[in-house]
Design a protein with these regions (language model features):
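PP2C/PPM-type serine/threonine phosphatase catalytic domain
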Residues: 1-194
Length: 194
């Protein structure tokens, strides 16, 4: 399977600093070509979101070089991958909180991490950074962890109401600004021509 990779970030219309960080790598393994990607969006309402997002991306790059080769020598086990990614996110949640306290400012970031193998995808997210599949249409593979998205899932708000709700960017959790985080794992089959 061939992988076409493109990655772009944009500062947007509100922020003075681009607080996005990302890394995308194509890897040759004994199991075939894989793609590992991580995208973090520093929280604009907090100072130094770019520091938090860069720290989490760097941590996942280290995981990729140190741990992924071992996992890739055999078939990827989702549970082992989930535990390792949760540990990266939770340890950096603590590290970012400690650093924030030391320097006296708040910082946080959302995160979405993805591993594509020849036939499966594995995704984990915290916050509202998303992963999509593009085939004949665009399909979101993750769920936002925001107050408004949660209210839509619970039937409190409709999709239409959510689009204009002033609370739509209120996160339920993020790395660095939440005491506890509960990353969500998604997996599925990689579709041909997607």
């Amino acid at each position: 399977m061939d992988f076409m990779i493109q990655a772009v970030t944009d500062i947007g219309n509100v922020k003075e600093t681009n607080q996005d960080s990302m890394s995308v790598k194509r890897l040759c393994t004994s199991q075939g070509t894989m793609v590992f990607a991580v995208l973090c969006d520093g929280m604009g309402g907090l100072s130094k979101g770019e520091v938090a997002s860069a720290a989490v991306v760097k941590a996942f790059e280290q995981w990729m070089w140190q741990k992924l080769p071992e996992l890739a020598n055999t078939s990827i086990e989702e549970f082992a991958l989930k535990l390792q990614w949760e540990e990266v996110l939770r340890s950096h949640n603590r590290d970012i909180q400690e650093y924030s306290r030391r320097i006296g400012c708040s910082m946080g970031t959302t995160a979405v991490v993805m591993l594509l193998t020849q036939n499966r995808y594995y995704i984990m997210n915290v916050g509202d950074s998303r992963a999509y599949e593009l085939q004949s249409n665009l399909c979101c593979l993750t769920q936002d962890q925001t107050l408004v998205a949660e209210e839509v899932r619970e039937g409190i708000l409709t999709e239409e109401q959510a689009k204009n709700d002033p609370r739509r960017s209120v996160l339920l959790q993020c790395v660095g600004a939440s005491d506890n985080i509960f990353p969500v794992m998604y997996s599925g089959e990689v579709k041909q021509d997607a």
